[in-house]
């Protein structure tokens, strides 16, 4: 299969192939191949940016819904890439992100936007109206970890994946 790809790339003059044995073979991009690589890279970057913007818009809608439910200040639980998108989406909304927590000690005490990442036990000290779980892959696990906050008047929301249907509580 790889040989078929190499043959196609060579026939389309995207690569040049030199050598006679597996040990002496070399594959180099031609000028046409370099142009094609740049074109593909630009297309990839445009698609990635478009996906980011779509996710940000979807998260903004969900954050607005959370705000309308009475949660005006929130802590994000999870300091990963999803949290970055959620945090950025919140900047143009009335919902105020007043803290961020993460279970990973390596992330704690580091800067996230204008906030310092704290350990989850700090949630009550921050005094949010709610906690938004910003980890798509571990939502249920995190929810179980902090669901006792609901008895203390702190709502816990699963924001879900921006690419799937709304998965909030």
Q: Where do the language-model regions lie?
A:
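Hydrophobic, well-ordered beta-alpha structural blocks that scaffold small-molecule cofactor pockets
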Residues: 1-14, 20-169
């Amino acid at each position: 299969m790889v040989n078929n790809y190499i043959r196609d790339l060579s026939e389309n003059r995207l690569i040049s192939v030199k050598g006679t044995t597996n040990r002496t073979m070399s594959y180099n991009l031609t000028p046409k191949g370099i142009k094609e690589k740049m074109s593909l890279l630009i297309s990839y970057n445009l698609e990635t940016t478009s996906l980011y913007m779509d996710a940000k818009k979807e998260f903004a809608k969900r954050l607005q819904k959370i705000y309308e439910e009475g949660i005006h200040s929130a802590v994000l639980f999870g300091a990963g890439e999803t949290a970055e998108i959620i945090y950025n989406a919140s900047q143009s909304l009335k919902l105020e992100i007043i803290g961020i927590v993460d279970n990973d000690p390596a992330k704690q005490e580091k800067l996230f936007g204008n906030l310092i990442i704290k350990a989850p036990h700090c949630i009550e000290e921050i005094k949010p109206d709610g906690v938004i779980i910003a980890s798509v892959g571990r939502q249920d696990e995190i929810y179980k970890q902090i669901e006792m906050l609901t008895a203390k008047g702190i709502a816990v929301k699963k924001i879900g994946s921006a690419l799937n249907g709304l998965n909030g509580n």
